[in-house]
């Protein structure tokens, strides 16, 4: 089932039985229908947990993960102790951009998943842009 964002919000407000995880799944499915990564422009997928943030650059045509990075990486942990800050997310975005430029990936499609473009998700995108990636 494909729902528009407006329909999802109506469902969330009207139907209290719609669980938060189900709502996130519906939002994720609507985004995946619109965002596809190709060989020329792979998809940058972001996952946010309470403690850390993870990102992957994915080629959807071949179903391969090209590059992955997280705030658990040693180089980021040495600079910033916790992975739940925007500074750690920004550093991770810059590191991801460096790794992708080594593999000659300059243009990507940003997939924020079910999360709002705010806070740590925005910090990853800003760090990747500062590192040289084009969205």
From Swiss-Prot:
> Which HAMAP family does the annotation name?
Ribosomal_uL18_B
Q: Which GO terms describe its cellular component?
A: chloroplast; ribonucleoprotein complex; ribosome
Role according to the record: Binds 5S rRNA, forms part of the central protuberance of the 50S subunit.
Taxonomically, the superkingdom here is: Eukaryota
> Gene encoding it?
rpl18
Which Cys pairs does UniProt list as disulfide-bonded?
none
Protein name in UniProt = Large ribosomal subunit protein uL18c
Q: Which CDD domains match?
A: Ribosomal_L18_L5e
Query: What is this organism's lineage?
Result: Eukaryota, Sar, Stramenopiles, Ochrophyta, Bacillariophyta
Its subunit composition reads: Part of the 50S ribosomal subunit; contacts the 5S rRNA.
The entry's localization annotation reads: Plastid, Chloroplast
Key words, A-Z: Chloroplast, Plastid, Ribonucleoprotein, Ribosomal protein, RNA-binding, rRNA-binding
């Amino acid at each position: 089932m494909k729902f528009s964002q407006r329909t999802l919000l109506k469902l969330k407000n009207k139907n209290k039985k719609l669980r938060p995880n189900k709502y996130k799944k519906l939002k994720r499915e609507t985004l995946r229908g619109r965002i596809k990564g190709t060989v020329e422009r792979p998809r940058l997928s972001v996952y946010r947990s309470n403690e850390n943030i993870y990102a992957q650059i994915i080629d959807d045509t071949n179903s391969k993960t090209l590059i992955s990075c997280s705030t658990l990486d040693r180089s980021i942990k040495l600079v910033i102790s916790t992975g739940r800050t925007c500074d750690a997310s920004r550093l991770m975005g810059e590191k991801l951009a460096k790794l992708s430029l080594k593999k000659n990936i300059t243009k990507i499609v940003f997939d924020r998943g079910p999360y709002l473009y705010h806070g740590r998700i925005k910090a990853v995108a800003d760090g990747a842009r500062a590192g040289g990636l084009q969205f």
